[in-house]
Design a protein with these regions (language model features):
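Conserved N-terminal beta1-alpha1 strand-loop-helix module at the mouth
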Residues: 1-92, 96-98, 106-133, 149, ...
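Active-site phosphate/pyrophosphate-handling residues
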Residues: 81, 155, 191
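Glycine-rich beta-strand-to-loop/alpha-helix junction loops that act as flexible
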Residues: 136, 169-174, 190-194
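Substrate-recognition "cap/lid" segment bordering the active-site pocket of phosphatases
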Residues: 145-156
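As written
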Residues: 130, 185-187
């Protein structure tokens, strides 16, 4: 089980979230956000953004080291082989990704496994799984994921959370304005991308999230 303190302000990003910058500058930006007080970090890199595999590994290891120095869990999105190779703190899987049982077998009992859920059927199935925490969404429209499902909104989120017994974070299009409403629901925190990557002062936003959850 994942300590719920780690789920309050769960930050997700990769170099592609700073597409206007070089990989090296994007890494610097991500580290600044890590230093703002986020509680967990999920490394999520999408698209052909690296010159070669060595550049990817250099990027991953630098971000992992920064997270370790800050005592922040370093979670790898989707890539189970990478998570095993660098001994990440865990892996986050989507519904179409590797089976949780396989991830557990390869990672061992002490690593974190997260699972994305989008509807009641997936949420109910996840209750019986070995996932340490769930990410439920998208709650609102989001531009951070090109393949995101249709957002289901706050009303359906409340209904879905009634059947949940696991540690869980809300994700998808979360803004400063929606934080107050979400904090009144049985969520352990929020997972955010653009709310922090586009922020001029991420520390203020992180502080607000910690005050609410």
């Amino acid at each position: 089980m994942m300590n719920k303190e780690y789920l309050k302000c769960y930050f997700i990003a990769g170099p592609q979230n700073f597409a206007e910058l070089s990989i090296e500058k994007a890494v610097e930006k991500i580290i600044v956000i890590l230093q703002s007080g986020v509680s967990s970090y999920q490394f999520r890199d999408k698209g052909t953004i690296y010159r070669n595999q060595n550049q990817r590994m250099t990027t991953v290891l630098k971000l992992q080291e920064a997270a370790k120095d800050l005592h922040i869990p370093f979670i790898v999105n989707d890539d189970l082989e990478l998570a095993c190779m660098i001994q990440a703190d865990g892996v986050h899987l989507g519904q179409q990704d590797r089976a949780i049982a396989e991830a557990r077998e390869k990672l061992g009992p002490k690593k974190y496994i997260g699972l994305s859920v989008r509807n009641k059927q997936e949420l109910l199935a996840a209750q019986k799984s070995d996932a340490d925490y769930l990410g439920i969404g998208p709650i609102y429209p989001t531009s951070s994921k090109s393949d995101a499902a249709e957002p289901f909104g706050e009303k359906q989120l409340r209904e879905l959370l009634l059947v949940n017994q696991k540690s869980i974070v809300g994700i998808g299009g979360i803004t400063l304005d929606s934080l107050n409403k979400l904090s009144q629901m049985p969520l352990d925190g929020v997972a955010v991308i653009s709310l922090l990557t586009r922020a001029t002062n991420p520390q203020n936003i992180v502080r607000k999230i910690h005050a609410l959850f």
